[in-house]
């Protein structure tokens, strides 16, 4: 076993991990799209400036799209779903919390209807949302979706009782611990190289 050459204070380690975290977020961002794991999204208290123009959002895992939506401020709308799901007012939000902690690995994508990708529909917001729904056939989009993909058996449906009912703050704290552990593991892996 290799012995550490440096002894880090908690503040130094936190600052280094924060720098790494910010770089990692930058890798998943462009002017018209941001992709971020749900557990990291939950730690954002404010919308990054570059994301304020994004008006489409996607809840997904590595192989299935669960939901596509539109809003003039997609970041805030994703938060509304998450908070509403905790209180039973959003089906996609409830699905996230019914599948906690597995859902920490879900991905949130924020997109701009003004990007080249949506030029084929004149960059119109509703038409851009419809294009994404037709492309991916999300599990929970019923409108404009002739054949929604069936929810994979590995996930609980949103109508089951919460298995781990806690306060929203406790769940966010769990996400924070998971991010810290992941960042520390990545940092150590990079130190070995």
Language-model segments: what does each one mean?
Residues 1-54, 60-66, 70-193:
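Boundary/linker segments flanking structured domains
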């Amino acid at each position: 076993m290799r012995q550490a050459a440096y002894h880090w204070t908690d503040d130094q380690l936190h600052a280094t991990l924060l720098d790494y975290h910010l770089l990692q977020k930058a890798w998943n961002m462009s002017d018209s799209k941001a992709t971020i794991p749900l557990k990291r999204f939950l730690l954002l208290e404010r919308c990054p400036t570059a994301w304020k123009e994004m008006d489409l959002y996607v809840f997904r895992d590595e192989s299935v799209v669960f939901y596509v939506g539109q809003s003039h401020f997609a970041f805030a709308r994703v938060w509304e779903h998450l908070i509403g799901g905790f209180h039973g007012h959003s089906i996609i939000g409830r699905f996230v919390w019914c599948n906690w902690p597995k859902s920490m690995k879900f991905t949130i994508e924020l997109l701009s209807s003004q990007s080249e990708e949506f030029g084929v529909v004149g960059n119109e917001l509703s038409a851009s949302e419809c294009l994404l729904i037709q492309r991916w056939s999300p599990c929970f989009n019923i409108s404009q979706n002739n054949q929604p993909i069936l929810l994979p058996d590995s996930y609980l449906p949103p109508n089951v009782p919460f298995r781990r009912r806690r306060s929203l703050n406790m769940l966010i704290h769990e996400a924070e611990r998971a991010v810290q552990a992941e960042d520390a593991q990545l940092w150590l892996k990079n130190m070995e190289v």
